[in-house]
Design a protein with these regions (language model features):
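N-terminal secretory signal peptides that target proteins for export/translocation
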Residues: 1-5
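Ser/Thr-rich, Pro/Gly/Ala-heavy low-complexity intrinsically disordered linkers and tails
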Residues: 19-42
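Short helix-loop boundary/capping segments
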Residues: 165-237
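Sequence contexts marking disulfide-bonded cysteines in secreted/extracellular proteins
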Residues: 18-20, 55-57, 78-85, 101-103, ...
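Extracellular-facing segments of soluble proteins and assemblies that are Gly/Ser/Thr-biased and enriched
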Residues: 108-196
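Bacterial N-terminal signal peptides
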Residues: 8-18
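Solvent-exposed N-terminal domain segments of exported/luminal and surface proteins
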Residues: 42-102
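Long, compositionally biased interface segments
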Residues: 218-283
Length: 283
């Protein structure tokens, strides 16, 4: 995420053994600190099943199968106010119903997490996984964004790589954060524009920057979709992005993939934001 880091969010997952790991997230209904992305404080919560959890907690984290759904209002200090969500704890569908006006500042990343990130781990995850052992990673995702033409947001995957297998459980990374922006408004990339690339049927603007938080540095690589924005992808080939990042020197074969997140970097407006269905397959 732009100048932000993670939370703990995700959804129900089915583990299938065999030649690879498949983690499809069940279809889910469409209704419902100061250190960025650390997911600061608060253990994952087990709620009564088959209920809608309404929460305005800064770092709400609800386990759903092998995923976690998180609020991750990581930059509340820069954007005082309240963020509220309605989460279906049986399916993982969620809606962000309230969020303050934060201007140009990324303040929150309500998302789904599979893997480990900043000390939060989804139950039963197969990550971290060596990049060298990955054949394919695909994902399907459906979401909805409301608001008006002046709102600012980006809906994106946030995918994390690290030279060792403990980054996600021990805090800040020192590898690469790879974002895939599927839908955004009144925002752009930052630092260095590397050009464009065609991947999985779309053209993407590629941006790179360096993140530095609490003495920890890592690469930030963003792929921003050109042309019409989308609100769903089906079997998006994430490995195509991994390979492109590797060709640019930002992912190493000896590193580990340790987290896949999908959410909305909230700034101003864009509500209601709904996450409707999500799945990941790793082989």
């Amino acid at each position: 995420m732009m100048n932000c880091i993670i939370a703990r969010l995700a959804l129900s997952l089915l583990l299938v053994t065999g030649c690879g790991l498949q983690t499809p997230l069940d279809q889910f209904a469409s209704n419902p600190s100061d250190n960025p992305g650390t997911g600061g404080g608060g253990a994952n919560t087990t709620w009564p099943q088959n209920v809608t959890v309404n929460t305005c907690e800064q770092y709400a984290a609800v386990n759903v199968g092998s995923y976690v759904v998180e609020s991750d209002f990581w930059n509340q200090r820069s954007c005082p106010g309240t963020q509220c969500m309605a989460i279906n704890d049986a399916t993982g569908a969620f809606t962000v119903t309230q969020f303050p006006d934060c201007g140009n500042t990324v303040a929150s990343y309500p998302n789904m997490l599979y893997g480990c990130s900043f000390g939060t781990c989804s139950p039963g995850s197969a990550l971290p996984k060596p990049v060298s052992s990955i054949t394919t990673v695909t994902s399907s995702w459906s979401f909805g964004v409301g608001g008006v033409a002046t709102d600012q947001y980006d809906v994106a995957y946030d995918i994390w790589f690290c030279p060792n297998n403990t980054c996600g459980s021990n805090g800040f990374p020192n590898g690469t954060e790879l974002m895939i922006w599927l839908n955004y408004q009144n925002v752009t990339g930052w630092e260095s524009h590397l050009g464009t690339v065609s991947l999985d049927g779309h053209t993407w603007d590629v941006w790179v920057a360096t993140q530095a938080v609490s003495g920890n540095n890592w690469n930030y690589l963003a792929y921003m979709i050109q042309g019409p924005m989308v609100t769903s992808v089906t079997n998006l080939d994430l490995t195509a992005f991994f390979k492109d990042a590797a060709s640019r020197g930002y992912v190493q074969n000896s590193w580990y993939l340790y987290a896949i997140q999908a959410g909305d970097e909230l700034r101003t407006g864009g509500l209601p934001y709904d996450s409707n269905s999500f799945s990941v397959s790793i082989k």
